């Protein structure tokens, strides 16, 4: 279990998780606001 925690706390794994989360967030925003290029334009 300690090895798994050490592996998950390394920088490349954290970077991949962060990028994947941001990509999923952008995809979901694009699904609900398909015509909005920017977030500020979707609420005006």
UniProtKB/Swiss-Prot annotation:
Coiled coil: none annotated. Its main location: plastid. It comes from the Eukaryota. One of its GO terms (cellular component) is chloroplast thylakoid membrane. InterPro entries: PSI_PsaJ, PSI_PsaJ_sf. It holds the Pfam family PSI_PsaJ. GO terms for biological process: photosynthesis. It is a single-pass membrane protein. The keyword Transmembrane applies. It is found in: Plastid, Chloroplast thylakoid membrane. The chain crosses the membrane at residues 7-27. The keyword Transmembrane applies. Keywords: Chloroplast, Membrane, Photosynthesis, Photosystem I, Plastid, Thylakoid, Transmembrane, Transmembrane helix. HAMAP family: PSI_PsaJ. Belongs to the PsaJ family. PANTHER family: PHOTOSYSTEM I REACTION CENTER SUBUNIT IX (PTHR36082:SF2), PTHR36082. May help in the organization of the PsaE and PsaF subunits. This is Photosystem I reaction center subunit IX.
